[in-house]
Amino acid sequence: WDKSIDDIGLDRGDAVIISVPFSGSGRKHERWKWLIEECNTKDIPVFVDCAWFGTCFDVEVKLNHPCIKMVAFSTGKGLSCGNWRSGIVFSRLADDDRCSLELQTEWRHGIHLNVAIANHLMAKYGPDTMPKKYMEAHAAVCEHYGFETTNTIHIAVAPQTPEWREYHRDETFNRVNIAKAIKRWKSNGNFAQ
């Protein structure tokens, strides 16, 4: 997979998977509007991965475009229950086998304990809980390390310098997961050396 949409464009028969917020930058993808218009025009199906829902803020997209066929949400990051994975997929393909229970597990059954834990947490915490709790820490960590803040609490964008090169995504973003630094700062006000 050495070519991307930026390299070769989109044609009928293609399919698109995109994350919201975009995993490369922790923000809405800068070409979201163009991508959706192009996919609507060329009848290209789109799968939207919203795994970071609950950790992001001020990211707004409409998911009712005809090209968007499936949208997935996860509870791992937003409810801080990563070891108890659960999520939901919404689909326009209701009669299609791709929407069957097979998507959940090879054993053809849901993981009921994980779903029960997620339901309990969702009843208690809203999608803005993490951003509200960690917004100040996110800004402090980004300022301390010279990162750009993003719209995703646990993600920052590092400068395009050699010391951050290992974090690059497609030569465009040096995305850094700052979750541990945020928790450290939030609990004792310290930064790692």
Language model features by range: what are they?
Residues 1-193:
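PLP-dependent class I/II
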